[in-house]
Amino acid sequence: MTVTIATLGFPRIGPKRELKFALEAYWAGKTDADALLDTARDLRAKTWTRQAALGVAHVPSNDFSLYDHVLDTAVMVGAIPAAYGWSGGTVDLATYFAMARGDQGRPAAEACGPGCGHAPGADGVPALEMTKWFDTNYHYLAPELSPGQAFALTSSKPVDEFLEAKALGVHTRPVLLGPVTFLKLAKTKAEGFSPLSLLSALLPVYGQVLRGLAAAGADWVQIDEPCLALDLTDFERAELRRAYGALTHAAPGVRLMLTSYFGGYGENLATAVNLPVEGLHLDLVRAPDELEAALAASRESLVLSLGVIDGRNVWRADLPALLDRLEPVVARRGSDRVVLAPSCSLLHTPIDLDLETALDPEIRQWLAFAVQKVEALAVLAQALNGGRASVAAALEASAQAARARATSPRIHDPKVAERLAAVTPDMTRRRSPYDQRREAQRARLNLPPLPTTTIGSFPQTTEVRQARAAFAKGQISDATYEAFLRQETARAVAWQETVGLDVLVHGEFERNDMVQYFGEQLAGFAFTQSGWVQSYGSRCVRPPILFGDVSRPAPMTVDWWRYAQGLTRRPMKGMLTGPVTILNWSFVRDDLPRETACRQIALAIRDEVVDLEATGAAIIQIDEAALREGLPLRRGDWDAYLDWAVESFRLAASGVADATQIHTHMCYSEFNDIIAAIGAMDADVISIETARSKMELLDAFVGYAYPAQIGPGVYDIHSPRVPAVEEMTTLLAAARQRLAGEQLWVNPDCGLKTRKWPETQAAIVNMVEAARRARAS
Ligand code: GLN
Ligand code: ZN
């Protein structure tokens, strides 16, 4: 008997983003369904055979998806809302993509950031609501269920893919999203209705799927219930027991490997170990301490899947150190009761480090992407089965890399540590309370009531993207690129003056991305060429890799600000990304607490804020688009996170005089549960997304008696639609019913980078007119 290895899921997009390009060609009508399905099949085949060749015994199938695995599950159980016009039978591609992206043929709205949950497809039949998958930057489509919902098995995808792999000689372990998590992720429009109440109706379909898999020859099936990493009620735990009792009964032929990830089981551990399943997966990266408890609490026959390799990050593991922990477990439990695995699906990591030819070799040896993580598992299994000596060279290389990383001067900058140690509480406080600052700012800025502004970026046109690409490839010179960007900036500034905006922006034409742009100028960040990770559907992001102590060698935005301000007498906002957002949209160090890394970034941003002020900026905006999405999965951990997140923002923002106005921006609208933290950030002005909620979400601010100024977005930039003046005056009136007039700003709900100029111009002209009318009324 030997220790085997499993992966819980592998990236779907392809090493060269083949799936993305196939999807987009299909959506654009350039290729047909066969071409798309061929690419998908080819990717699956390569993924299976590659994992099998690397020594994975439990190769997953049905982890592939054309768009999203939660959507696949909804389709599998026939949960297709009436709006999509489905009349039973197999769900065709048109219906599937309508659920994913809204109306056919309509281009997906682009997100404003990797974690932005803005659903594509603005008009026509809307897409299902898209939201973040637990605490990742992956977005799933929330199933929409209604009271009395009927379920029926309407897809043979799990069985088809199992057979497809079997035909290639790979015996897979199919993956299903578990019924309880599926229902917990679902949304409903019916008030007071809980989708979990549909469990009894749903279970028979799962029973059918499991029997189908058994008939096709599957022995193990992986069933994912990551809801076990959340706070659950006693009722929910009881429902899990009921569900797995029923499923074991319905399909006695298959052995279930129950997984949860993104954290420990915590309070749910006793429930999990006692479910009538044959295997249980533990996320030992996020919850290393749960191993002992699980060993002690579980019956001897339960197979434990030990998630020891980090599926959420890019660091190479220290294999000898892991073996020190694993060897006693194997000795105690028996090799046939232990499976080695990544902590979660590898969906959240880039695919292959071998594609990175430009990475600094020193940094590169510290990294492992999906393929390298599987290789590491193979080394671990070999060492456990054949002794450490049988893989001595691989173990030594791993230990060597770990030692090098622990001591590298590239990572450890004593000056950063000293500076951090010298941070005093007054550095996180503005000099005076808001009321006093407001007066100082009023005197300095002299703005009209309901001042108008935008969130920062203007359209990233084809020309802008082409110029950037040409510059990156060395096809155009520094000077040519710079001249081009200056011209774009000058045009944007002149246009803003003409339409009568009160507070201007330079337009962010020089920025590739709101995090990458800063990461590239800060010490401590590295970037990949092919390190793509799926964000949703065909959209992928390449998160920066935060590998070392962060500092700011030189000013990052000051020259652009100076240039832009030199073109106008109106105030030009300095435009920065905040420390929490930079942190949350990067791969972060695993050798330093997140909060320490965040404070380091905060100090670097603070330097920039202070320099902008010294250069003359009267208004500086520090975007924290990703503050909310960093919230931990369990409520009990929220306060600690919010404390250091807010403190980091304040550290970045508080180095300026009272008369300098600090803005922040957040791309979402759910503030109810974090309003105290928003208040504690102590920004002078916050702009938020509200356009789609008819200003109702302002109630959170009203209830909190939020003292400072707010720019509730008066129109949705995620759609090309140009809002009429009246629409925005109505929204402004609704806002004024809730807040004092002098608290309000007028702005769109996010940056305009994904829009085109004609609609942007028309919308802003209307917005300025709406503000004028509102002032007069
Ligand atoms: N200043 C950024 C922009 O306008 C903010 C983007 C965001 O919040 N996602 O593009
Ligand atoms: Zn935004």
Swiss-Prot record:
L-methionine binds at I455, G456, S457, E508, D623. One of its GO terms (biological process) is methionine biosynthetic process. L-homocysteine binds at I455, G456, S457, E508, D623. The active site is at H718. It comes from the Bacteria. Pfam families: Meth_synt_1, Meth_synt_2. NCBIfam families: met_syn_B12ind, PRK05222.1. Belongs to the vitamin-B12 independent methionine synthase family. This is 5-methyltetrahydropteroyltriglutamate--homocysteine methyltransferase. It comes from Caulobacter vibrioides (strain ATCC 19089 / CIP 103742 / CB 15).
